[in-house]
Amino acid sequence: MNASDLIRIMQFGDSVLPVGAFTFSNGVESAIQTGVVRDVPTLKGFVLTALKQAASCDGMGVVAAHRAVVADDRDGIIRADWAVNNRKLNEESRLMATRMGKKLAEMSIHVVEHPLISWWLEQIKNGNTAGTYPVTQAVVMAAQGIGQREVVVMHQYGVAMTILSAAMRLMRVTHFDTQHILFELNHDIEKFCDIAEIGDIDQMSSYVPIVDVLAAVHVKAHVRLFSN
């Protein structure tokens, strides 16, 4: 990998990329409020569950969309996008995916200036596609020539950091704790990337009941710091 590709991965994989990720907790807010997450070990377990779910659903969508971009199959990109969106059972998850996806597309046309990204944003605005974040990420990175494995790693990192960053504001956990959790999960992320690279949208699965139960709890919560 050359330096140019590496710095693009770092730029677009940055947890402070201006796409609104800081407004979402990926479910950990409800998990902490209900006691499902209460200390470092349970936080690590929650992140691990989220990464596994992401690999078997959004991650496969990333790979399917990336392959469609490489094959210049624009219908395939849209199919992958709807497949990701349709497997998000709760409204807050759909909101997170589509809001961040549109923000990423809007930012990227000013940064990358690639015709495929302009086309993608047009499809989102016209309602021809949902514009989920995982698929938008695949479109933006594939347009820059970044490989599918690298994009899946970016997505997995984003899932983990969204949860860990939110946890810092919601519970007694230190920066050292969250960084140690992330480091320890490296081996698991490698395995989850293998799952995602199946890339078959017919095999995508988002079945993790605890996540949907926590989402339902979050909707009715009286005090909320995050949008999900």
Swiss-Prot record:
InterPro entries: UreF, UreF_sf. One of its GO terms (cellular component) is cytoplasm. It is found in: Cytoplasm. Its main location: cytoplasm. Pfam families: UreF. One of its GO terms (molecular function) is nickel cation binding. Keywords: Chaperone, Cytoplasm, Nickel insertion, Virulence. Coiled coil: none annotated. Transmembrane segments: none annotated. Belongs to the UreF family. UreD, UreF and UreG form a complex that acts as a GTP-hydrolysis-dependent molecular chaperone, activating the urease apoprotein by helping to assemble the nickel containing metallocenter of UreC. The UreE protein probably delivers the nickel. Required for maturation of urease via the functional incorporation of the urease nickel metallocenter. Expression of the urease operon increases the likelihood of bacterial survival by contributing to acid resistance in vitro and in vivo in BALB/c mice. Y.enterocolitica enters the body via an oral path and must survive the acidic stomach before being able to colonize the intestinal mucosa. This is Urease accessory protein UreF. It comes from Yersinia enterocolitica. The lineage of its organism: Bacteria, Pseudomonadati, Pseudomonadota, Gammaproteobacteria, Enterobacterales.
